[in-house]
From Swiss-Prot:
NCBIfam families: KdgD (TIGR03249), PRK03620.1 (NF002958). It comes from the Bacteria. Keywords: Lyase. GO terms for molecular function: 4-hydroxy-tetrahydrodipicolinate synthase activity; 5-dehydro-4-deoxyglucarate dehydratase activity. Its EC number is 4.2.1.41. One of its GO terms (biological process) is D-glucarate catabolic process. It catalyses: 5-dehydro-4-deoxy-D-glucarate + H(+) = 2,5-dioxopentanoate + CO2 + H2O. This is Probable 5-dehydro-4-deoxyglucarate dehydratase. Pathway: Carbohydrate acid metabolism; D-glucarate degradation; 2,5-dioxopentanoate from D-glucarate: step 2/2.
């Protein structure tokens, strides 16, 4: 087992549904292949963007099978696990059964546990299999240094994904723990904050826009690493910040706006097909995104883009 967290740009594919509400398995496979062809360094299925909260166990298992058969070992495949502890452990074992590389331990939503409770929750999941595990901090699951230091002693834990955004805490974590684990930026629209995270030791991020304009996220990240401030600022102003402004207009847009972007560029998905409580993108916001992408793809064309 390679005890190392993925680095670079991480793909978090959405789960496409057909008009009857079932998983569109062909579309899922095609969209994962699109991410692979675009050079993403890892695939994380059935996580937040994949509407993990809405998936039945059978659907979850099907998604894993599709992901592993499509990826075929080209890059690491991770799954999302979380929710109630027994279900999280069950999904962790399903993931191990189907040969994935690891899983992202999602926050236990709506439960504000003490630090010891958070530790026991993560420990129970991480030690239930021999797979790599990445801890995800966001919303109501915010850890202190003592908790993180205890967690990194668990051999299965290879990474920490931050979706909380407290620079003071992150500096304390990275300075105290160093390279014992990998550091992943999991903030909403992670491209927005990646320039602040790189100097702290973060060398990967989950990219929502890579589901539909992966070449632009790649160009942005390469420019960051190369110190090309002109390109960074251009992509910030023309693509990233405008899309982020739309994303903030609706709850659930972290998912449905991805589907809208995919549909706009011609990928096989119906952006209206999301599961409650997520709702589709409103018409005005869809049109705003469409206009941004039209301009972006003129300036930054892609051979993989099928539309526009």
């Amino acid at each position: 087992m390679n005890r190392k967290a993925p680095t670079g740009i991480l793909g978090f594919p959405v789960t496409p549904f057909d008009n009857q509400g079932n998983i569109d398995e062909l579309a899922l496979s095609q969209n994962i292949k699109y991410l692979l062809d675009s050079g993403l360094e890892a695939i994380f299925v059935a996580c937040g963007a994949g509407e993990y909260h809405s998936l039945e166990n059978g659907e979850y298992e099907s998604i894993i099978e599709i992901a592993t058969s499509t990826v075929k070992g080209q890059v690491p495949v991770y799954t999302g696990v979380g929710g109630n502890l027994s279900d999280a452990v069950h999904k962790a074992k399903l993931s191990e059964k189907h040969g994935v590389d690891g899983y992202l331990i999602m926050p236990a939503y709506l439960i504000n546990g003490e630090q010891e409770g958070i530790y026991q929750y993560v420990h129970s999941i991480a030690t239930s299999t021999d797979l790599n595990a990445i801890v995800y901090q966001r919303d109501n699951v915010v850890m202190n240094l003592d908790t993180i230091e205890k967690l990194v002693e668990i051999p299965q834990i290879v990474g920490f994904k931050d979706g909380h955004g407290s620079m003071e805490h992150i500096i304390e974590f990275t300075q105290s723990i160093g390279n014992k684990i990998g550091w992943l930026n999991g903030m909403p629209m992670a491209e927005v904050t990646m320039p602040a995270y790189i100097p702290l030791g973060f060398d990967s991020y989950s990219s929502a826009i890579s589901n539909y304009i992966p070449h632009i996220s790649r160009k942005f990240y390469d420019a960051l690493l190369e110190g090309d401030e002109t390109t960074v600022n251009e992509i910030y102003q023309e693509v990233i910040l405008p899309i982020n402004r739309i994303r903030r207009q609706g709850k659930g847009y972290a998912i449905s706006l991805i589907k809208a972007g995919m549909e706009i560029v011609g990928l096989p998905i119906n952006s209206n097909n999301v599961r409650p409580p997520v709702t589709p993108v409103k018409k005005e916001h869809y049109e705003q995104l469409e206009e941004i992408l039209k301009k972006a793809l003129i300036k930054y064309p892609s051979n993989l883009t099928k539309s526009l």
